[in-house]
């Protein structure tokens, strides 16, 4: 049995849960999320918490037990508090701006890089170089942050590029002149 899967998911006050078969819908102050469970997992609400039950004894079901418990917990946290990722843009002349539902970045290329912001995600820009990505779906927030970082991954010589806040880039010395 999964140690993570057995743990109950505490429901904060103000979270509405509706369970219809294997479909779980969570609604909170930040929004609404939907999660579909596999056939071998059952969920029920008890004493202000959600409890997952594994009805099969296969290796796959044991592996999925903890995964879906974590995904449901992330959904509960998302509709209650939301998630955010912070990115920093380093480089001379590198900047970003939000124009409607598009993020426009100047990253030293001959053209501006335009990224379409998906539904359910908000992007804020501070000082033209600090991005804050917010949303209720943890997977989507992380995927958007990774997509934006992928436009210019930090290079090890000068440290130019887009990186997560607090991320340490290992620097290299570069070539040394020989005489």
UniProtKB/Swiss-Prot annotation:
A GO cellular component annotation in the UniProt record: cytosolic large ribosomal subunit
Subunit record text: Part of the 50S ribosomal subunit.
Pfam families: Ribosomal_L6
Biological function: This protein binds to the 23S rRNA, and is important in its secondary structure. It is located near the subunit interface in the base of the L7/L12 stalk, and near the tRNA binding site of the peptidyltransferase center.
Entry-linked HAMAP family: Ribosomal_uL6_B
PROSITE patterns registered for this protein in UniProt: RIBOSOMAL_L6_1
Family to which this protein belongs: Belongs to the universal ribosomal protein uL6 family.
GO BP term (any one): cytoplasmic translation
Highest taxon of the lineage: Bacteria
GO molecular function: rRNA binding; structural constituent of ribosome
Protein name: Large ribosomal subunit protein uL6
